[in-house]
Curated annotation (Swiss-Prot):
Role summary: Forms part of the ribosomal stalk, playing a central role in the interaction of the ribosome with GTP-bound translation factors.
Record field: compositional bias (Basic and acidic residues): 76-87
Molecular function via GO: structural constituent of ribosome
Bias type Acidic residues, positions: 88-98
CC per GO annotation: ribonucleoprotein complex; ribosome
Stretches the record annotates as Disordered: 67-107
Organism of provenance: Pyrococcus abyssi (strain GE5 / Orsay)
Keyword set, alphabetical order: Ribonucleoprotein, Ribosomal protein
Top-level taxonomic group: Archaea
Gene: rpl12
Record-given protein name: Large ribosomal subunit protein P1
Length: 107
């Protein structure tokens, strides 16, 4: 993450994001720079509009609030469970009545 932060720092102050600048920022922060990681980051950021990426990354935060509607469905589920329980009770009663009818046959 330090490498990405260094690149963002360079971008925010208007400096070019290159290997030498990244290495200098990392050393100033007390991080031992890894040349391979620096080269990979510079290559990955080549041709990328960082301002546009930051703007797009900030947008989904507002969309994340949408799933809050799920708890409103809980009462509907409770009603379904209550209906199932009532149906089970009715089935139990009808079984008891059926058994009572059989006992009447045998006296």
């Amino acid at each position: 993450m330090e490498y990405v932060y260094a690149a963002l720092l360079l971008h925010s102050v208007g400096k070019e994001i290159n290997e030498d600048n990244l290495k200098a920022v990392l050393q100033a922060a007390g991080v031992e720079p890894d040349e391979a990681r620096i080269k990979a980051l510079v290559a990955a950021l080549e041709g990328v509009n960082i301002d546009e990426v930051i703007e797009k990354a900030a947008m989904p935060v507002a969309v994340a609030a949408a799933p809050a509607a799920a708890p409103a469905e809980a009462p509907a589920e409770e009603k379904k469970e209550e209906e199932k329980k009532e149906e089970e009770k009715e089935e139990e009663v009808s079984e008891e009545e059926a058994l009572a009818g059989l006992s009447a046959l045998f006296g």
